[in-house]
Amino acid sequence: MTIIWIEDHDPLPDPARVPFPASGLGAAGLDLSPARLYEAYRKGLFPWYSPGEPVLWWSPDPRMVLHCRELHIGRSLAKRIRQFDRPPEAGPVAGSAPSLCVTLNRAFPAVIAHCAQRGAARIGLGAARAGRDWPAPGAAQGRDGTWITPDIIAVYTAWHRMGYVHSVETWIGGRLAGGLYGVGLGRCFFGESMFSLAADASKVALAYLVRHLQARGTAWIDCQQETPHLASLGARPAARADFLELLAAGRDAPAPPWGSGRLRADGRLEAQPVA
């Protein structure tokens, strides 16, 4: 297998034009910057590496994709989501912040910090622990949650401030109970990592994200690698060529600006800030 070494001034290879192995690992380098991330995601690449390694760039074949209309919500999860769907006045004091709510872009630093916990599980939405529920290739090889290195945190936080990376947070009793973050480009969304500190908290965040994406006109989420867990939620594998066609059609499509606040049951943002 040939891995292309990328100098800081070199462009990343384009999987639509350059042969990549089915595993997805096709390039490596040292540059990890917001500009490099922007180039990578537009080409269907994402970084995944461990401390001490160069930045490794992946484009697996097949690629796991969750089409928003196909999200599978079981009976127990649907019941849990309805608890979060109650309007603010359903809280203990009329007009107060509800004891259960879901927000967008209100606690990104906390979300990525939870996702980065060392030794975190990668699989298991709803488990009372942090982890990557959208696993990168190689997850089955036994690497732990340390793939979210300080450099990853720094560059994705910078990209968040630039408006490209977004978090969804689940709150229970005023405390952060779960969440996720990912990358938004045009009408494309790329899931990066999730965590859960209470049963179903990350699943609720995912359900609200899907609603919000649909309200924005985004039809799918890139889940990166195929796993039985993702399949149980309705995600299915797509050939790399098909995924790249989806990406090409959506990455430059006009989309509403992202915001911050409480997410409503219909996927839209509350006009007022969350207390």
Mark where each language-model region is.
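N-acyltransferase acceptor-side catalytic subdomain
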Residues: 1-275
